[in-house]
Amino acid sequence: MSKGIMIIGPSGSGKTSLGKMVADKLGYPYFDVDDYIWRRDTEKPYTVMYSREEKINRLSKDIFPYEHFVMAGSMSSFHYAFDDKFDMMVFLYAEPAVRIQRVHERAVERFGERVLEGGDLYESHLRFLDDNRRYEKNGSPNLNEQREWMNNMSCMKIEL
């Protein structure tokens, strides 16, 4: 059975960077949960999700061949299907101002003027930034649900 390290936290906290670094250091494959949540065959990115069953099936199929793996991201609606596969869980946190800046810079780097005022992704980008600002309260994902998930896990836990 595959066993892995799961890195959670708000967008812009550095999950992907840490996940890739740890995977590289350990020689494990890295899986970004976003790749299993959002359909890529859409005109506007990050607008259409796979169904819960598709998320679980696609990710399960990809990690199956590996004894160990590193995974990062938010899987609030389907983590139950993977909880027994984690040997370690890392909660990574960054202050809201730092996160918002990182998320905005990343979006501009990926999508250019599309996320700036007048662009076709501007409104969805603003909603995403607002949701990230609300991580400590009622965003999706949010601090309380991720802490609860981590507290209910029986694996090793680290907070950074």
Where do the protein language model's features map onto the residues?
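Hydrophobic anchor at the beta1->P-loop junction of P-loop NTPases
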Residues: 7
